[in-house]
Design a protein with these regions (language model features):
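Active-site region of glycoside hydrolase catalytic domains
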Residues: 1-265
Length: 265
């Protein structure tokens, strides 16, 4: 932030985003020139929000929040900025520098597929006063009373994965790739050295079932599915080893202490 003293930092972020869009389009161009069959995608941190009530104000808030997610893929899939994003720039007085050549490149080389991460869902409301909040992948939101929570307060919502798949595929009509899905939890090593993580098995089973339904019942074109992650590693959202995702346990604590021995869960 110190480098941009005197500037609107949010505007700086959107300017950087524009450069990323152009770079992505150029990368797609190069990949297709080298191999016409090569597929290049974009990546979304897929936050799924539900309106907390059926009040129009809450539904509008949910729509606005989802636009904050979709503005990236709307641009990279369609090859041009959505009108709502350009209107936001205008309303806020942002002057995002972009050339005609930039816009031509973006239009000519959109992505071929959409990859995304999905861990949980949450609710949003126009007025959050008095409502219980819940943690999430990148931000806090309103707790959904119909969904259980993980050890870190993330809402466990397998059906939300199906909803995400359907929303994305209906919006873009391009193949999807689920590249992150998993449960961060506290694992206990038993006296015999075993680690029983039935809760993680249940989480993955139910999410895979909903993923399958999106294919068989909703017609979603899904390229693939990968979990986060095959082995315990430092959780980016909390900087903790104790927030474990893997199928393989690593003997190390939040402070780097341990043997680093690996064990099958």
């Amino acid at each position: 932030r110190d480098r941009f003293e005197g500037k609107n930092f949010t505007e700086v972020i959107f300017q950087a985003m524009h450069h990323q869009f152009v770079a992505s389009a150029l990368a797609t161009k190069i990949a297709h020139e080298k191999n016409p069959d090569c597929k290049v995608g974009c990546m979304l941190t897929k936050l799924t929000y539900y309106p907390y009530t059926c009040k129009p104000e809450d539904v509008l808030e949910q729509q606005q929040r989802m636009r904050q997610i979709y503005c990236y893929s709307d641009t990279q899939v369609h090859g041009e900025y959505p009108k709502y994003l350009l209107q936001m720039y205008k309303n806020k007085g942002f002057n995002i520098k972009m050339t005609d050549e930039d816009l031509e490149i973006m239009k000519k080389y959109p992505v071929d597929f959409i990859s995304f991460s999905y861990y949980s869902s949450s609710c949003v409301a126009a007025d959050t006063k008095g409502l219980e909040m819940s943690a999430g992948n990148t931000e806090t939101a309103i707790k959904n009373p119909y969904n259980p929570s993980s050890d870190w307060g993330w809402q466990i919502d397998p059906i939300g994965l199906r909803i995400s798949c359907v929303d994305l595929y209906d919006r873009y009509r391009k193949p999807l790739f689920i590249v992150e899905n998993g449960l961060g939890a506290k694992d206990t090593v038993e006296e015999d050295g075993s680690i029983n993580d039935d809760y993680r098995i249940d989480y993955l089973r139910e999410h895979i079932r909903q993923m399958y339904k999106s294919i068989e019942e909703d017609g979603v074109e899904l390229m693939g599915y990968t979990t986060w992650a095959p082995i315990d590693l430092l959780s980016n959202s909390t900087n903790q080893m104790s927030k474990r995702y893997g199928f393989i346990y690593v003997d190390v604590d939040d402070y780097g202490n341990g043997t680093y021995k690996r064990s099958k869960k």
